[in-house]
Every structure is written in structure tokens, then in C-alpha cells.
């Protein structure tokens, strides 16, 4: 009887890094992010990121009514890692990170792009896994994109591990 209760109880939640995680929450996050979330993934990041999918873009915005790219990175970092980032993508690139190559990106690293003036950082997202990152697109709101898409591949500046 004790084994049966343990088995049933273990079907609903898991303890990772000192947190109880509901598998239904992870399943919903995986559906919204459109990829599998594995045992070794950064669950708090994946869950928080998934809650922002579909939020409209708003320049200078930092809430669920509208958010821009640096507002998204700043808000998710504050929520998940209790870390404050600067308010714009260029400042985040210059002051908040240690540069990381595309090949060495890990979940939670920031990814920087030049979408305007050539070579100048003007867009930022958060790397999730397997080439996927979350960001606030000015035309589509908060979405997950792939670093291997031509636009992002051609405009990628650097990754960054937050200091």
C-alpha cells in the first residue's frame, strides 16, 4: 500500500533544485514553447518563459499588456533568477554579461542581435535550448525562434552569460 501511494504521488509532482514542480505545468509549458522539456532543463526558466508567449509587443513595456525585448529579458531574469538587468539591449550587452560564443550557449544565456545599424546591438532574447530562444518581436509579440533561421543567423552578434 505504501508503495502504491508513493507511486501515485510521484506521478503528479517532482522535486528539482529544491522546488516542487507539477508535471501538468511542465506539460503546458512544453506545449506553449513547442519543444520537450527534459529532466535536466532549467524548469523555472521554461515555465516562466512559457507564460509570456503571445504577449503583445510594446516599446518600453514591461508587463503582460505589452513588453519589448529588453523588458522581457529583464522581467524574466528578475522573476526566475532574482537578478536585475539594465533596461535596454545595448546596456545589457555592454554591462550585464560575459560574452559567450553561439556554440557554448546554455539555457538562460542572453542572445544579442543587430537588427538596425550594422554591428550595433539592438535586440536581445533568452536562450532556452537546442537553438531556440524567447524574445519579443516587434511584429509578432513574444515568441520562440530558432537561431538557425536566416534572419537570426545573419544578425547574431553574441551570446552572453549574465555576471
Model regions: which residues?
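Structural motif
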Residues: 108-110, 131
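Extracytoplasmic/secreted envelope proteins and their assembly/folding machinery
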Residues: 42-46, 50, 70-74, 105, ...
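Catalytic cysteine-centered active-site loop
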Residues: 32-33, 55-107
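Sec-dependent signal peptide recognition
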Residues: 1-2
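C-terminal motif of bacterial Sec signal peptides marking the signal peptidase cleavage site
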Residues: 7-10
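Aromatic- and glycine-rich peptidoglycan recognition patches
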Residues: 12-26, 32-37, 99-100, 117, ...
